[in-house]
Amino acid sequence: SSNKETMKKFLHSMDAVLQHGDFMVVYPEQSMWWNYRKPKPLKKGAYTFAAQNHVPVLPCFITMQDSDILGDDGFYIQEYTIHIAPAIYPDPNKSRAVNIEEMRQKNYEVWKEIYEKTYGEPLVYECDDMPTIA
């Protein structure tokens, strides 16, 4: 939210929920692209909540396969599989900033492994091969 008071209330509520031992679903990529199969870049938010409240993140990654059923839109209906990986814990001996980055990197590596195992191909982003525009 662009409203500072709303954000303060949200952040306070998030801390309260996590410190109470409850769970919260956070999409660390902060957006969804319909039927996009590759992991999207992970933002810091979910890992910030985890690190500052000394709680783990539970990496979940959804893969999809075409079914045999052609939808009304001319595309095959997708079949989804939810992969739940082991929890990633913040290290109490490290700073919040280090934990945020390490947890984010570990989550990415888990997603990359799931992607490559499921689809049988290396995770490559086509835009990585494009020249940088200065």
What are these regions (language model features)?
Residues 8-134:
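Non-catalytic C-terminal accessory region of glycerolipid acyltransferases
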Residues 1-5:
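Catalytic core of membrane glycerolipid acyltransferases/transacylases, capturing the structured
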